[in-house]
Amino acid sequence: MEMEKNQHISSLDIPVIDLSNPDEELVASAVVKASQEWGIFQVVNHGIPTELILRLLQVGMEFFELPETEKEAVAKPEDSLDIEGYRTKYQKDLEGRNAWVDHLFHRIWPPSRVNHKFWPKNPPEYIEVNEEYASHIKKLSEKIMEWLSEGLGLRHEALKEGLGGETIEYLMKINYYPPCPDPELVVGAPDHTDVNGITLLVANEALGLQAFKDNQWIDAEYTTSGIIVIIGDQFLRMSNGKYKSVEHRAKMDKEKTRISWPVFVESSLDQVFGPLPELITGDENVPKFKPYVYKDYKFRKLKKLLLD
């Protein structure tokens, strides 16, 4: 099975959905279909200005090009149990290959959870650009959540409310993958599914994201102005299995620096989530997953403990 899983093809393309199509019903249907069959898709003409995305990429790259001492000004404290801050992460994937990536985590919404201590002061535009991007990405994510809720036959607020409503958190992560002379020995990010509800990601021109479908790894082709949307575990479980939490990974590039900006849309740690009650309607629609407090689910998944 492992040999099969390591097979790689590029003949399939992840779905690309044009949000400027005036037929919103058609757009919503495409989003639902992609979430059911793939768990990953790209949206284009999504309303977030291309100039803003390019500025986001620029200030992020400038931060990671700073001397290490400057980056350490926003480092994750050694004794912190939270995730926010800058750090260099080393780990091995299931095949024993080294995985390394420098990264920076900080929340961008809601305001009550934003800690500017972990937002770089250099480059000077960093805070302004990220605040502007946060307002746009929140609006886009809420629209996608509405379509996904309606795709379940529910009120358009259902998934947002199930995730926590106004307490939903938006966690920005910047992944910085330096060039690697031998990508076969190193991976950028090991195979995984996201624990959260939905992830919205932009990246620079160095491709490297792969998704697992039909027992094959597929290169995710994308443009720097497009947004990659990834369905996570919370929406898999809240939809009672109707939406797919896609397994994905990041590979290294021999010559180019790859950098990506996922925003994880997730519950607060104390939020209870599970199959939405409206979907559990009788013997044919029994719950497929146990409900969890989000922090307990994250802990059990991290420790590879039994979940259901």
Swiss-Prot record:
Its cofactor is Fe(2+). Residues 167-267 form the Fe2OG dioxygenase domain. Transmembrane segments: none annotated. Widely expressed at low levels. 2-oxoglutarate binds at residues 175-177, 258-260. Pathway: Secondary metabolite biosynthesis; flavonoid biosynthesis. Disruption phenotype: No visible phenotype under normal growth conditions. Belongs to the iron/ascorbate-dependent oxidoreductase family. Catalyzes the formation of flavonols from dihydroflavonols. Possesses low activity in vitro towards dihydrokaempferol and dihydroquercetin producing kaempferol and quercitin, respectively. This is Flavonol synthase 3.
